[in-house]
Regions:
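Short amphipathic, positively biased membrane-proximal segments
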Residues: 1-324
Length: 324
């Protein structure tokens, strides 16, 4: 029996086509927008940055989900062994207890994504909520002596976890949610100094966009005549920092409100978890030149962090990619 040319390849891409269709499906956008507003309104304070993973340098949600997933997977293995139902039930309970904090971390990240990412993210959350419900039912069955039903609902829960993980992987690796969108800058910008314009082209205190080796660069001139330069596309989701606001030595992304220190690109406030690549600057014969700084930024002390927050405000940025 012959196969159509490319038939196997088409079959392999069916799931991808379904996921691409999910990204474009706007029917749940009203629900998504309402949930987004609710998550943004949570009074989390500085805990919001901790949940984003700013302290870790990348999103903390993937780290936190290891506890519930690992617990539930281990419970499934123990369910295959006679006489281990008590230990399996304990692991189901541990997974349920850890699911809440992991979900909260995922929610604060999700609320600051583009519309297409949030659509897939809603399906990811629904699958995980189904898993929690099934494991909750599994725990009840186990406690009430219905071990067989507990094992069965646990396996259904593990299936839902797998579906949620697949959707989460699509968000992370195909849609690049949570990725550092400025990571390629050191690999694209050539070494040495690059002339970007005459001094008079840069008004004091106003962000200006220039390009170096096809990489957009944010340039800010201080009132004293000194210059700062950072990669212009925000590390969070590539927002245009040149359209953001500048205050007290920091620039605020206009899309989701991430704040970066102009002197070295340090991410003072999230949702960005990675700093901006920074450039050294100099003036030669009336022209501004920049050179990519190869060493990373230094973390600010508490006083510097508080000053930057006071200068840039505590609200998130605009609703780029959102209809909320």
């Amino acid at each position: 029996m012959s196969k159509k040319p490319g038939g196997r390849r088409m079959g392999q891409n069916r799931m991808l086509r379904l996921l691409d269709a999910l990204e474009r499906d706007s029917r749940a956008d009203a629900v998504i927008d309402a949930l987004t507003r609710g998550v943004r309104a949570l009074p989390l304070g500085r805990a919001r940055d901790a949940l984003h993973g700013r302290w870790l340098g990348h999103p903390v949600h993937p780290l936190m989900v290891q506890v519930p997933i690992g617990s539930w997977m281990s419970a499934a293995v123990l369910d295959l062994r006679p006489g281990r139902s008590r230990e399996a039930g304990l692991l189901v309970g541990v997974g349920l207890a850890a699911a809440g904090p992991a979900a909260l971390a995922g929610a604060v990240d999700w609320a600051e994504l583009h519309s297409e990412q949030r659509r897939v993210g809603l399906a990811h959350a629904v699958a995980n909520a189904a898993a929690v419900a099934l494991y909750g039912a599994s725990l009840v069955c186990r406690v009430t002596g219905r071990a067989g039903a507990g094992r069965a609902t646990g396996l259904l829960g593990l299936t839902a976890v797998g579906l949620g993980g697949m959707l989460g992987g699509h968000m992370a690796y195909r849609q690049a949610s949570g990725a550092n969108h400025a990571e390629e800058v050191p690999h694209v910008v050539g070494a040495g100094w690059h002339r970007i314009g005459a001094v008079e082209e840069f008004p004091a205190g106003r962000p200006v966009r220039r390009t170096v080796d096809d990489v957009p660069v944010l340039v800010v001139r201080e009132p004293d005549g000194s210059f700062h330069a950072l990669a212009e596309r925000c590390s969070h989701l590539a927002g245009p920092l040149s359209e953001g606001s500048v205050a007290d030595g920091c620039v605020r992304c206009p899309w989701h409100g991430s704040v970066f220190r102009l002197s070295d690109g340090w991410n003072v406030r999230g949702p960005a978890t990675a700093p901006q690549p920074a450039f050294d600057t100099r003036v030669v014969d009336g022209y501004v030149e920049v050179s990519l700084r190869r060493q990373g930024p230094t973390t600010p002390g508490p006083a510097g962090h508080e000053a930057a927050e006071a200068a840039t405000g505590t609200e998130r940025g605009g609703d780029h990619g959102h209809s909320a």
